[in-house]
Amino acid sequence: LSDSPRKKTTPQSSKKIITYAIIGIVAVAAVYVAMFSRSAPEISGPGTNTQNDEAMQQRFEEQFCGTQTAPNSNTYVAEVALPAECEMPVGIAIDGAKVWYVSTKRGLLGSYDTAAGTFNEYEIPSWPTRSLPFTSVPSWSMSWTVKIDGRGENIWFTDQNNTIWRFNQSTEDFDMFKVPAKYPSMMDFDSNGNLYFIGINSQSLFFGNVSRIQNGTSEGFAEISLPLEGFSGVSSDLVTSGGLVVDKERSDVWVSLLAFQQKKGQLFQYDIETNKVVRIVDLPTDLGAPVGMELDNYGNVWVADHGTSTFFRYDPSMDNITRFVTSIASPKIYGGSTPPNAYTLPYWIDKGGDGSLWFNEHTGNKIGRFDPEELALVEYWIPSQNRAWALCPPEATVCGIANAMQFAVDPENHLWFTEWTENKIAKLDASKQVPIAVVTPAEVALARGESTEIKVTVVASSDFSGQMMASGTFMPNAALGNSTGIFSEESVSLSSGSSKEISYTFTAEQDLKQGQYTIMLGAGNDDVSYMKAVRVNII
């Protein structure tokens, strides 16, 4: 395994492209089989096997290789097509001017030089699905996380085949470590450069002592059991690991477990110094898919719920949860009209250099940036759409999602993400100014069945024309449920330097439970939106 891998250098201008996709964190193959079985033609007679294979490969290419072979772009996002066909990139990391990613089909560790516009790709020594035909299900091997260690010398990445890999940039050698986690997914380094990681099909936390690990062995790895009393009565096959984040300042590791079908999720706080789980947080049933996890500058835990349109903050000092939501899923995803059961599915969260929290909206086809101080959400539209991953009407010319699967943020708040459906990586340039900001009151209070007027001031830093937007934590899909909200004006056009106050009248439904909710109010256009959170106290 220590032999130097095959290396390829490819100019950006000479790429061939075919494109690809995904739907969830575990049952990808099952989804593909189900979708294919609904759409594959019935074939019988001589040559049936060959024709079936051809039909299945064609369907696979339509769903997992996409149809948009050229990179797309908008004001903020610019895509880059990968050099090989059907690479299926997922995990990604940024190292200065280099962007690293893993091809889950081809078994390649790739790097893109953002200054030169060139690729290097290194063949991972062992990747069983590399040689499988597209007609095999699955014909890929997931690599969810790519990390660069503190020295900047090594690239680490997970491999669903119970493996973690390390690539040395200087020697161009790979080391392979067999780990006790089943289907390793997320990993992070502690302040000493050691590894903590989880496996999708494991219900434990795992530790890797980097000074003791040995190539080709499981030496130096240990399992840290998590108390599972909260999942009593649930089959272990249904309990999976969600997310992980290491708190280097406080020497803690936060982990989430979930049983999605049972709408059950928990957060665990593990103290590195005492080697004990010191806190277990039972999540409400409407937050049963805690996946992405990150810490803000104050030690609060932020979690993306990959079963709804919700992301939330857990405050350890107050032991409470505050919910926020994305915008409602765009009708562009569905060819003109958003169905009532459409969710944006926030997936992973990472913190930018300025403390802002980034997350990818898996089925919302957006990248979100949330300011935890201002409680302001900016969402950036991803310009590619694969119609095979939405219920698109035949007449729709624009429909689908790009399946943005993982992302990384550099210190300057530039973000790179992978598009598993499109065989592309993409850069989001957050240094470009968003054309508007929104000012709202911090909170309002009203009784059930009553109405209140909320003043929303839209301030333009450049010319802007768009639509007013509202969403709320009343429903899992960010809709208002039986409550209602009406803007005094649905459209807004502003010249640079101007502002406009628009009224939003919110009426709480008669049977709404007392408590605190959040409404997100703002405006957006085809490329970007800006929304502010308003606390709504139902008394």
Which residues does each predicted region cover?
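Blade-level signature of beta-propeller repeat domains, shared across WD40, Kelch, NHL, RCC1
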Residues: 395-434
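A short helix->beta-strand "capping" segment at the edge of beta-propeller domains
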Residues: 62-86
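Beta-propeller fold detector
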Residues: 59-62, 78-81, 120-127, 175-179, ...
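Long beta-sheet-rich domains in secretory-pathway and surface-associated proteins
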Residues: 432-539
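Beta-rich, blade/repeat-based domains predominating
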Residues: 83-96, 128-151, 180-192, 198, ...
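Short loop/turn segments that connect beta-strands within beta-propeller blades
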Residues: 113-117, 167-172, 213-218, 271-275, ...
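Secretory targeting signatures
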Residues: 1-48, 521, 539
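Conserved beta-strand positions in repeat-built beta-propeller and related beta-rich domains
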Residues: 100-106, 139-141, 155-161, 195-204, ...
